[in-house]
A protein has these predicted regions:
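N-terminal membrane-targeting hydrophobic helices
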Residues: 1-166
């Protein structure tokens, strides 16, 4: 998927989370305000492609993109787990706004991985436990397939919001 698709899907998902939990999400003694996460979700949506030298993040961080293979470690569940731990630690330390920013960043990162799971190339989701790439669909990047994917993603989010708010 392209960077724009990742940003659209990540932001849409964060908007959906915000819509169904506008007053906050109580997790482990802290009430997270997902609306604050809207500030960081697009960055999180782009970050897994820091390993791709042609991507915006890869261009900004050439040292990293030069030494990592595309859809390698950055497309696993390892980073989202690290971000969840960081989010909980920031909440426990009572650092204002930071947990929400980490939450938004993490939502963007996870949505990026989920979107790439729908691409024929797949992702090494369970690396290092399982090194093979997995995919659940075969949408082609930079074709009309990608537009269909975006419409389906937006539709699922709208349906989830509608169902959860009724």
């Amino acid at each position: 998927m392209t960077g724009k698709t990742h940003a659209i899907c990540g932001t849409d998902t964060m908007l959906a989370i915000t819509a169904v939990s506008f007053r906050g999400l109580p997790i482990d003694g802290h009430t997270y305000l997902p609306a604050v996460g809207l500030l960081s979700v697009a960055a999180g949506s782009y970050m897994p492609d820091i390993d791709l030298h042609r991507s915006k993040m890869g261009q900004r961080h050439k040292f990293i993109s030069k030494h990592l293979t595309h859809r390698g470690i950055t497309h696993t569940l390892l980073f989202p787990v690290i971000f969840i731990v960081a989010m909980l630690m920031a909440a426990a330390a009572k650092i204002p706004v930071l947990p929400e920013l980490i939450m938004g960043f993490n939502v963007g990162w996870v949505v990026h991985i989920l979107a790439d799971l729908c691409n024929r190339k797949g992702v090494p989701l369970l690396w290092p436990l399982y090194r093979r790439r997995v995919h659940i669909a075969a949408f082609l990047t930079s074709t009309w397939h990608e537009y269909v994917f975006i419409i389906l993603w937006l539709g699922v989010n709208v349906a989830c919001v509608f169902f959860l708010l009724r």
